[in-house]
Amino acid sequence: MQDNFPNIVSKIRELYGEGFIPLHAPYFGGNEKKYLADCIDSTFVSSVGQYVNLFEQKLAEFTGAKYAIATVNGTSALHVSLILAGVEANDEVLTQALTFVATSNAISYIGASPVFIDVDRDTMGLSPEKLENFFKNETVMNTDGFCYNKSTGKRIKACVPMHTFGIPLRISEVVSICKKHNIIVVEDTAESLGSYVNNIHTGNFGQLAAFSFNGNKTITCGGGGAIITNDETLAKRAKHLTTTAKSPHPFEFFHDEIGFNYRMPNLNAAVACAQLEQLDLFLKNKRITAEKYSTFFKEIGVDFVNEITNTKANYWLNAIILKNKEERDSFISYTNEHEIMTRPIWTLMNRLPAFKNAQTDDLINSYWLEERVVNIPSSYRQ
């Protein structure tokens, strides 16, 4: 494989040119400056303004969801989604160990505990088979109608599967399994804006979903996140909680519960609106890049992570799977030495100090992927 390292570098440079090549750089080729100037001129630069409302409307239209609530980042969207799902302190939430730390952090903010379930190798997302096995062997339904962990005695309230790198997981199966056990599904769609399963946008399968618009995402507004849902009651409470739980009144300040200052500022929303206008262009461009990568890596015998049947990925971050950790590390060192940014997948959550005592299943696929997956440059190509 090391003999192919120069060829891979040449291919990436063929796509992205000379000089330093980042992993995923933002592209501002639309109305970003115009909308920002308009926002500044309006003086409405904080969490009240026309662009916040417009972005929510346009995001809902794009995803096909009935409601979208803009937040300051993806982690805040996850945090509030879990509260809306009814997760409380001392509950447990099923999720994957192979994820970005925000997923587990959001669970911990509530005082709940993550339980880590394995992923499928082909999607890198939560495995329906492993999830079913966990319910069968490790849980019991109580007379109160809730599912409990036999080992800990704690209530399992929610499940957070993530569409890793924008590759849709087998979400219909996950939702079906969770429904049998009275578990609410919150989709972590931080990376999957523009990804579909059977022509339905990711995020519309669970009761709630959380998006991220961080600087390295398919569209960005510097930070930013959003909750989508098709439940009007959840949507209204999401907006209420993210605006400090303030009761509507022309001048009085009355807050009827503990809320959060999580509303997306109008400045960020102005950029987000301009980015969303270009999303179709971004997705088309990234799909062409992924197809070129897929063809090239197939020719040299390297596994490229592709979407599975009946799904459409946004190919946010393209990924390859190498033979072992040694080959992975050699490749990452070689490419970065040649000014091409590549990176390994995240350290598994159960290896981190904060979650080292969390319950897990065997995580066979997660450990296997952790040692082999490498992300390669995936920016919009001009």
PLM segments and residue spans:
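N-terminal "arm"/small-domain region of PLP-dependent enzymes with the aminotransferase-like
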Residues: 1-45, 377
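PLP-dependent aminotransferase class I/II
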Residues: 11, 53-57, 65-66, 118, ...
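Phosphate-binding glycine-rich loop
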Residues: 45-92, 98, 106-108, 116-118, ...
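Hydrophobic/aromatic ligand-binding patch that stacks against planar heteroaromatic rings
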Residues: 105-107, 177, 201, 267
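Structured binding elements
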Residues: 111
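Active-site phosphate-binding strand-loop segment of PLP-dependent enzymes
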Residues: 122-221, 226-228, 233, 375
